[in-house]
Amino acid sequence: IHIERGPYTLEWINKFVDRAVEMQIDEIRLLEHCYRFEEFVPMYDSVCAYSEYVDAWFHRQAGVRKLEEYLDLIKQVRNESFPVEIKFGLEICYFKEFEDFTAELTKNKGFDFLLGSIHFVDDFAFDHKAEHWTGMDIDKIYHRYFEDSVSLAKSNLFDGIGHPDAIKLFGHKPSYSLT
């Protein structure tokens, strides 16, 4: 569950806890997108250079917090008692060339889990707008998406993969079989 639509307060976290209790869920996993933290902003230089749209979107949304603020919230929550178990993590955009950078930023920070996600293929933001696919080589994008997915899994940086089928968001399909 992404928590980015509210403040880093116990009151905000309690809204998720209360809903979990209502639904008889005994564990919740809360996370943030890494791009929201200024420390991760350098990973996005090439995707911003690729597209004016992404550049504008990114600079409205990205780097609005410091990672330490999130880590402080995690410590604060862990010092309290809740009727459900709360785990904290990060969803990290996977870029092969930033594996070492990602490892350095996340090691020994106390996260319960890290999710790797692919939102960009060769800097193309495939899950932003359907019209951005116009004129794109769908077969090539799918091929590179799966190459990147394999690299993500082999990196051993992550505990899981976020939305592994995001590539099909707008209904585009390659000419070859995916089975």
Q: What is the predicted function of each stretch?
A:
Residues 40-42, 101, 127-129:
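Short aromatic-enriched loop/helix-cap "lid" or pocket-rim segments at secondary-structure transitions
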Residues 15-18, 47-50, 105-109, 133-136:
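Short, low-complexity, polar/charged sequence segments that are solvent-exposed and flexible
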Residues 1-96, 170-178:
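An N-terminally biased module of ancient metal coordination in phosphate/nucleic-acid-related enzymes
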Residues 21-22, 73-83, 102-112, 151-157:
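Acidic (Asp/Glu)-rich catalytic clusters
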Residues 8-19, 97-105, 144-152:
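Short, acidic/polar
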Residues 92, 96, 108-111, 115-179:
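Domain-core and long-helix interface of multi-subunit machines
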